[in-house]
Structure formats: structure tokens, C-alpha cells
Amino acid sequence: MNDARKKLYISDVTLRDGSHAIRHQYSIANVKAIAAALDRAGVDSIEVAHGDGIEGSSFNYGFGAHSDVEWIEAAAASVKHAKIATLLIPGIGTIHDLRNAYDAGARVVRVATHCTEADVSRQHLEYAREIGMDPVGFLMMSHMTTPQKLAEQAKLMESYGATCVYVVDSGGALGMNDIRDRFRAFKEALKPETQTGMHAHHNLSLGVANSLVAVEEGCDRIDASLAGMGAGAGNAPLEVFIAAAERQGWHHGCDLYGLMDAADDIVRPLQDRPVRVDRETLALGYAGVYSSFLRHAERAADKYGLKTVDILVELGRRKMVGGQEDMIVDVALDLLKSAEHERTHAEPTMSEAGR
């Protein structure tokens, strides 16, 4: 259970996960303003990168307005207290890219893998520790395996040097009891000194609730973003989580009103698509789909005259995971072909029409 005297580690992800919400188009001025506001408000770390992690800028994931190094340097120059964090997905970013991020000012790295593939994080976690970074394990799509198997993967990351391992609800598909079960499994499997973290998405409107439950189960680090800025329906809104934590009497060290101002005055105006629970983002949580698929699926739906929800539900049925963004167009074409087949067979033949 949570010790109310314990200082929660507040990890902001507006400048990384939030990048998905605007197709990775943060300007340097945006980064500086957001990082400075977060630093003044007292968060512990500020994650900065392309939405898909360092070196994610590509045809497959979407090109960023700037390089990760440029974003990280801008954020690092704008803070006095908060640590700059970044995210690396093995296979997208390399240890050489991680070194570049470190030289630019990043001091925390979250090495992200699919929830059953922790073994691919070893090289990156060990290297991060070697160069003096805080190495964190990040188990994405945590709803796609059992609590016990997830804990086994967390144990692997711990053995590679991770100081903290996250339950990552990439699809926003986990319920509150699912969160309890996973953190209890972590507690049984991990060493007492290894911290745990929660990264929620708000697709079922449970981002804040799940984060609160995680803390009740002893979670040390909470991810959240200003105005919920993130993939899909967004992450747990930082200002909302802090307000709820304050009402619980928990020690978070943040300026609530400063966060509220930053969310409404700086971040929300940047959204070209509202970050909210709606028909499409709800489908992500319902079908258990990777939240960053949203904008890609919307683009495919618009191009081929389909419903975004139909594409997302089919992606969920096929159990597509992060890194398979290129398959979204294939799924759209399959749905289009199926619809044309049904339409052709539904039309009466000439002989039937003449009866």
C-alpha cells in the first residue's frame, strides 16, 4: 500500500508522447516554453523525443519538425531543476543515438519494448547505466500478457540494470483491477530497491484512476502530460492527477495552479485534433490498440473512404503492436476489398433485375 509520506516521482511526457497528438511538429519555441513551465511547476523529469522515441522520425512513423538532439538541447537549456528524460525503442534507436541524447542533456532513458520482448533491452539498459544515465524499463502494451508474465519481463529488465520498470498501458485498455494485479505481481517479483512506474492512456477515461490505483499499490513514478497531450485520447492529464493526488494528501512536490495554467495557456492551443475520448479514441481502448495508431488510421480512412473505427477494431482483432504502423494501410486495403466484394455480391444480376 502507498505511504502518504513518500515523495512521488512525477514524470512528464508532454514533449514525447504528446508529440503524437500533433504529428511530431513541436517547434523549438514550443519545447522551450513547455519545459520551462514544467520546471517551474516542480516535475521531476521531462521526457523529450519524437513520439516513437529517439530516431523515430521516419516515413513509417512520421517525420519530426526537428531532430531529437535539437529538441533535447532546447529543453535542457530551459530547465533548472528537472531532469531531461528520453525514450528509446530498440531497433529504432541505437546506443550511438543514446549517446547523442546524453550529450545533448538527457539524463534518464526509458528503454521501451513490447511487453513480451524485454530481452531486446539489455544492450541499451546496460549502456545507459555505463554512461551514467538513469536506466528505466518500459513494457509497452502491458494488457497483452498476464500479470505474472509481465513481472517476469520486468525481472529481466531489472537484471539488465533498470532502476525502475513501468507498466505501460499503451492501448488504454486496462481496468483498475488489471492495474492492481500487475503491480502486485511486480512487487512479488522485483527487488525492494527497484522502483515501479505507471504510464496510462485515457482511451477508456481511466488514465487518472489507473494512476491513482498504481500509487495505492506502491508505484513510485507516475507518467502524465499537460492537458493529457498524448497518443489516442492522451495520457493521464498531469494537472488532473496532481489535483487528485493533492486531495489524497500525497506528497508530489508540484505547483497545481502552475500546471493548470501551462495546460490551458500553452499546450491545449497546439492541438490540431482535440485530445479527448471520442468515437475513434474510445475504439482504441475498447479494441486494445496501440494509441499512436490513431492519426495513421485516420489518414488511411480519409484516403480510402473508410471509417477510422473499422480500421482500429480490425487492427485490434489482428493484435497489431507498436512498430507495425506500415500495416495500417494494408488493413485499410483489405477492408476496402472486402466491402467491394460484399457490394458486388449484393447487387442483383441482370436476369434477377428483369424478373
UniProtKB/Swiss-Prot annotation:
One Gene Ontology MF term: 4-hydroxy-2-oxovalerate aldolase activity
Enzyme class: lyase
Swiss-Prot/TrEMBL keywords: Aromatic hydrocarbons catabolism, Lyase, Manganese, Metal-binding
GO biological process, one term: L-leucine biosynthetic process
Pfam families: DmpG_comm, HMGL-like
Cited Gene3D superfamilies: 1.10.8.60, Aldolase class I
Catalytic residue list: H20 (proton acceptor)
Binding-site list for Mn(2+): D17, H199, H201
Protein's name according to its UniProt entry: 4-hydroxy-2-oxovalerate aldolase 1
Species for this entry: Burkholderia lata (strain ATCC 17760 / DSM 23089 / LMG 22485 / NCIMB 9086 / R18194 / 383)
